[in-house]
C-alpha cells in the first residue's frame, strides 16, 4: 500500500524552517554549552533552587542569545563559510536568507532576551550590555586575534556573573573564579571545534587556537580541561559538598579521558564528536551541584 504523498510546505512554513536552521534549532549542543554553567552559577548563588522566575529568565535568555549569536556569526562569516564544506549550506551563505533578514531576526531575539533581563535588577542589566558587546565582537576576532576562542570564552561565561548579580545584587569573587574556570572549558571544546576546520581556516587566512597551537593542540586542550575542573572543584568546595558533588567531578574527569581518545588522532570526525558531546560534561557538573543542594 502506497503512503500518501506529503503535503508541500507553505511559503510561511518554508521560511520558518530556514530561520530555525539559521539559529541551529535542531542542534541544541551550542546553547546547552551555555546553559549548564549558567544554571550551575544560579544554583550556587541561590544556595539551591533559585525559583521559577530566575530559572525561566536564564534558560530562555540563554537560548535566545545563543540563537541571536548564530545570526550575527553567519552574517559576519558568510564570505568564508561558502568555502568550507561543513558551513557552505548555511542559509545566509547560500542566499536562502538575506543578510537583512538574518540581522533583523538576530535583533528581535536579542531584544526578547533583553526584555527578560529587564525583570531582574540594574547590575544584571548592566552586565548584559557588556555580554552583548562581546557577542557582537566575537565573529570578527578570528580575523585579528590568534586565540579567538578566548573571546568566545568570555562571551560564553557572562551568564555566570549575571546569575550571581540577579540573585545577590552583586558579583562576588566566586563568580569571577567560576567564569575563569569556564573560560578554560570553552578554550578546550572550541579548540576541538576549530580542529575540524583547521585546513580550511589556514587556506582562508583565518586565525584560530587550533592553528596557533599546532601540534600542541591536544596537550593544551587536556590542560584546559584540567584547569576548568580543578578551578571549579576548589572554588565550590566550601559551598557545595557531599558524595554526589565528588562523583560528578570524578565523572567529569572520566569524560575528559574519553574525549582524549576521540581527539588524539586529530581526525575531523573525532574532534567534532568530542565537541558535540561536551555539553554532557557541563550537565554532569550541574547535576552534581544541584543534586548536592537538594540532598542537604
UniProtKB/Swiss-Prot annotation:
It is an enzyme of class 2 (transferase). GO terms for cellular component: plasma membrane. Its EC number is 2.5.1.39. InterPro entries: HB_polyprenyltransferase-like, Prenyltransferase, UbiA_prenyltransferase, UbiA_prenylTrfase_CS, UbiA_sf. Its cofactor is Mg(2+). NCBIfam families: ubiA_proteo. This is 4-hydroxybenzoate octaprenyltransferase.
Amino acid at each position: 500500500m502506497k503512503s500518501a504523498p506529503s503535503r508541500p510546505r507553505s511559503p510561511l512554513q518554508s521560511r520558518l524552517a530556514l530561520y530555525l536552521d539559521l539559529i541551529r534549532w535542531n542542534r541544541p549542543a551550542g546553547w546547552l554549552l551555555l546553559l549548564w554553567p549558567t544554571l550551575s552559577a544560579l544554583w550556587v548563588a541561590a544556595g539551591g533552587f533559585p525559583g521559577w522566575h530566575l530559572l525561566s529568565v536564564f534558560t530562555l535568555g540563554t537560548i535566545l542569545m545563543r540563537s541571536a549569536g548564530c545570526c550575527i556569526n553567519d552574517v559576519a562569516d558568510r564570505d568564508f563559510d561558502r568555502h568550507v564544506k561543513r558551513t557552505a549550506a548555511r542559509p545566509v551563505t547560500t542566499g536562502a536568507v538575506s543578510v537583512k533578514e538574518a540581522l533583523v531576526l538576530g535583533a528581535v531575539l536579542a531584544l526578547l532576551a533583553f526584555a527578560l533581563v529587564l525583570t531582574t535588577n540594574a547590575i544584571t542589566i548592566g552586565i548584559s550590555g557588556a555580554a552583548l558587546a562581546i557577542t557582537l565582537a566575537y565573529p570578527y576576532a578570528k580575523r585579528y586575534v590568534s586565540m579567538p576562542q578566548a573571546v568566545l570564552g568570555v562571551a560564553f561565561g557572562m551568564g555566570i556573573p549575571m546569575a550571581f548579580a540577579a540573585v545577590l545584587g552583586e558579583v562576588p569573587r566566586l563568580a569571577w573564579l567560576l567564569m575563569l574556570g569556564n573560560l578554560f572549558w570553552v578554550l578546550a571544546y572550541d579548540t576541538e571545534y576549530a580542529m575540524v576546520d583547521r585546513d580550511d581556516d589556514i587556506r582562508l587566512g583565518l586565525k584560530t587556537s587550533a592553528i596557533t597551537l599546532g601540534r600542541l593542540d591536544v596537550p593544551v586542550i587536556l590542560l584546559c580541561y584540567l584547569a576548568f575542573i580543578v578551578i571549579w572543584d576548589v572554588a565550590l568546595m566550601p559551598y557545595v559538598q557531599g558524595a554526589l558533588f565528588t562523583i560528578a567531578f570524578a565523572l567529569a574527569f572520566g569524560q575528559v579521558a574519553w574525549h582524549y581518545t576521540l581527539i588524539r588522532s586529530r581526525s575531523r570526525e573525532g574532534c567534532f564528536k568530542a565537541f558535540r558531546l561536551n555539553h554532557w560534561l557541563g550537565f554532569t557538573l550541574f547535576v552534581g551541584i544541584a543534586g548536592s543542594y537538594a540532598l542537604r
